[in-house]
A protein has these predicted regions:
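Eukaryotic intrinsically disordered, low-complexity regulatory linkers and tails enriched in Ser/Thr/Pro
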Residues: 1-71
């Protein structure tokens, strides 16, 4: 499944190995990431949200349509 990120890049979630979210203190936003490989920095940022709850909801919606591990 291809998704367009908030920054207009296309990411194939079928090739991702996992999803997670984290708080970016610089931007003061919660960021949902899709991991694409073995390395710590092999990921695409999918979108930003204002609250942790929104980030969890986005991540769970994405995980419901593709087979990825939620980290």
């Amino acid at each position: 499944m291809w998704v367009k990120t908030q920054w207009h890049s296309l990411v194939n979630l079928d090739r991702c190995t996992g999803l997670s979210y984290w708080y970016d203190q610089f931007a003061r936003k919660w960021v949902i990431r899709a991991y694409t490989g073995e390395g710590e920095d092999d990921y695409w940022s999918i979108c930003e949200t204002d609250t942790e709850e929104e980030a969890k909801n986005w991540m769970n919606r994405l995980a419901a349509v593709v087979e990825v591990v939620v980290v």
